[in-house]
Every structure is written in C-alpha cells, then in structure tokens.
Amino acid sequence: MYIVQIASECAPVIKAGGLGDVVYGLSRELEIRGNCVELILPKYDCMRYDHIWGLHEAYLNLWVPWFGAAIHCTVYCGWVHGRVCFFIEPHSEDNFFNRGCYYGCDDDDMRFAFFSKAALEFLHQSNKRPDIIHCHDWQTGLVPVMLYEIYKYHGMDTQRVCYTIHNFKHQGIGGVKTLWATGLNREAYYFQNDKLQDDFNPFALNYMKGGIVYSNAVTTVSPNHALEAQYTDVGCGLGHTLYQHKDKFSGILNGIDYDFWNPEIDRYIPYNYNQEDFEQKLYNKKALRERLLLQAADKPIIAYIGRLDNQKGVHLVHHAIYHSLNKGAQFVLLGSATEAGINAHFRHEKQFLNNNPDVHLELGFNEELSHLIYAGADMIVVPSNYEPCGLTQMIGLKYGTVPIVRGVGGLVNTVFDRDYDQNLPPEKRNGYVFYQSDNQALESAMNRAIDLWYQSPEKFQQLAIQGMKYDYSWNNPGKEYLDIYEWIKYKW
C-alpha cells in the first residue's frame, strides 16, 4: 500500500512533543510491514538538518494557489533514518516557516492552512496518487476538506484520508480569511455546524472539526481517550461532532521504540537485563543511588519522569514525594515546568530537601539520566489529570518498573491493577491504578505497592516481570492502522 503521512512534526528532525515520535514510529512500522511510506513536512529553518541524509531539491517549481494568486515553493527530498521525507519551502514575504520556531506565531492558522494546501498541490502536480493520506492534529485538519472539496475534481478522487488527533486542546481556529486564501471560498457553506463552524464561536472555523467531518476515518491515541473525548470535556467542545461520526472514530494506542527503550540493549544504563536476569536491575538501582547521592538502604525507589504541569497532576506529584518518604521509600524526580509558579515551587522544594538522603529532584531534562531512572527505580508514578495515551507507563513496564497510575485515558488501556482488576487473571496484571484526583486515592495505591515491596518482595518482583512481558511496541498499532487503511480503501 502507498501511504503518505502529512504532519507538522517528525522526530528527530522536527520534534516539539510526542507528535513527532508517533509520526516517525508509525511510518517506520508501516514500512517494516512492506508498505511504501512517504512523509510531507514543512521545511522549518530551525529543524535538525543533521538528521537528514541526502537532502536535495526534488521539485523546483511548485506553485501553490493562494488568495487568487500563487506562491512559488521548492520541495526538498531527504532521508530521515531511512524514511523518505519531502520538505516544502515557500518563497514569500510571509516567511511561513522561517520563524525560528515550529509553533507559537500569531498567524499559525494561516501558516498551516498554507502547508495543507501546499502538500495537496505537491501530490497533485507531481502525479503522486497514494492509497492513503494520513494527517495529524489541527495543523493538517484542512487537508481532507480541500481534498474532497477541491482536489477531488482534479483527478485525486481515489485517495482516502485517516486523521489522527493527538491533542484536543489545540484545534486550529481560523476565519473567512482561511476560506479565501485556500480557494474554499463559500462562506455560507462552511460556516455550518455540520461543516467547519466552531462550536464556541459561530464566526470562526475549526480546522480539527473539519478534519473530523471530512476524513474517512478518525483516530485518537487510545481507546479510552476516544470514549472520554465523546462523553466528557476531554474533547474540548468536539464531543458532539465526534459522537455524530462515531462509526468512523476509534482509539489506537501509540507505541514506543524498543530499539531505544529496551533494558536488554540500552546503551545508557550500566547493566543490561531482561526478564530472565532481572537481578541485574538491582545493580542499576545501586548505580542510580550513587549518581544521585542517595543513601544505600533497603528501601524502594519511587520515580516521576515528565513535565510538571496541571495535565500531569502536579499537585499529586508533590504529594507523592512526601508520602514516599513517610512510607519509608526513596523518591527521584526528573521533570521541568514551563509555568513560572510551578517552576518556583519545585525549586523551593529542591532546596528544602537538598540534605535529605532519600530524595533527589532533578529539574530539567536529561535523556541519559531518564534511562537510568527507569532501570533503577522500583516504581513510577503517573498521576495525570488527563493522559491521551501516555508513554511513561509503557517504558516503565518494559524496564520492570511497576507503574502507579491514575485511571484516565491510555493509562486505563495499559496498566491493570494487581489487586482489583477483575477482567484479567492475576498473571496478566501489571501495576496499580487509582481513580480520584486526590491525595487519599494516590496514597491508597502507593501504600499497596510499597507494602508489597516490603512484605512480599518475591511477589513484587513477579509483578514487575509480568509487566515486562507486555508488548507496547509499534507492532500492534501498525497492524491496527493497516486494518483501518484497508477498511477505508475498500469501503468508501
């Protein structure tokens, strides 16, 4: 099958968050399964050119219709760890992608409306006719709209679109200007509730809503998050639209790259290990203590790795530190905060706890240290307020680090409570789950984990090994996406 991914990010060249990892990981898996996969991306001035091999001008005269005229673009081609990537560079006074950043400009709505138009125009002018066009997040939400309202009438009538929503919080809001720029034009037609009209502002257009309405299949990043988006405020106002299109909407878990996150081959940890020689994990625990100057003691290490913000349940992260100490455990934190108040709070906590031999707070991010923490910790807490998919718990499971998670989003689909999950036999359970976003619920789950570590170390080790048996690579998601591609290719 011939698949084109259109996205605003692809790791490691363009990475602002998890989107880039997903686009790369899925593309790689689809190619491993024998498909032809190409990616279309903006040519940002600030992307990591050192990760592109053989970058060259591939299409010199791409003229993209824009506001009744046309903008000249050059399309470059290069290989990113074996993936064929096309990078679109517009030559205009707007300098859409020469801003020194990926996002955060006042005209982001127009920047990515243009990118969506340019991607389709490139496919059209170069006579590329993929079976599937896979778009990601609001930045490419207009691709299916323009495909079916404009390009279908120019010979692109067999392409089918899968649209994946990674983050409902950012939906892409435009207006009449978007319609006139892209050639969609008909205001009265698109400003309708069953088309692109924003549900909060009737005078605005919602790019993500357009992607939902016009795509042949819509996915988000976990089955439980798909339900939350339809029936709770997690959908950020798009719940009704998603429910109307529920027959084509589903959730597929993201995967993690086991070439990078795998204790058996991890180059960042001093002692490699797997399920059979799990005792090597204890040596990594010793190495972690030595690096972070924690005291050598017969205590479990509980970790938190991730952003320090409200989405991640920062108030519970704070409580987990002190509850761990009260329960006779050690605590390691590796995280960063962009919000000034949260950053100041944790800097104060770091200073206050500086002389405590059982805690270490590392503010910032350190790739190498994150691997050692996963390998050396006994448990990892993920107390998120909402979590579309979550990768931390998947990595923890692979490293035999028992996750303690709040039962939201993709955490529900990946962590199964040792004591209370009645849907799985005991040998399939792999962690601890709590549901309320309060200290008492967190404490209850942490207590059960810590008590098992102290009272039945053999059972705790068995729980950790059970978690290592789960496969959260891209293998299963790749198959599920191919099933969706086949479905929309032959149904529509």
Curated annotation (Swiss-Prot):
Alphabetical keyword list: Glycogen biosynthesis, Glycosyltransferase, Transferase
Reactions performed catalytically: [(1->4)-alpha-D-glucosyl](n) + ADP-alpha-D-glucose = [(1->4)-alpha-D-glucosyl](n+1) + ADP + H(+)
Pathway, per record: Glycan biosynthesis; glycogen biosynthesis
Keyword Transferase: yes
Record Gene3D superfamilies: Glycogen Phosphorylase B (3.40.50.2000)
UniProt-annotated binding residues for ADP-alpha-D-glucose: 15
One BP term from GO: glycogen biosynthetic process
GO molecular function, one term: alpha-1,4-glucan glucosyltransferase (UDP-glucose donor) activity
EC number annotated for this UniProt entry: 2.4.1.21
Summary of the function given for this chain in its UniProt record: Synthesizes alpha-1,4-glucan chains using ADP-glucose.
Family: Belongs to the glycosyltransferase 1 family. Bacterial/plant glycogen synthase subfamily.
Xref: PANTHER family: GLYCOGEN SYNTHASE 2-RELATED, PTHR46083
Protein name from the UniProt record: Glycogen synthase 1
Native species: Trichormus variabilis (strain ATCC 29413 / PCC 7937) (Anabaena variabilis)
Species lineage: Bacteria, Bacillati, Cyanobacteriota, Cyanophyceae, Nostocales
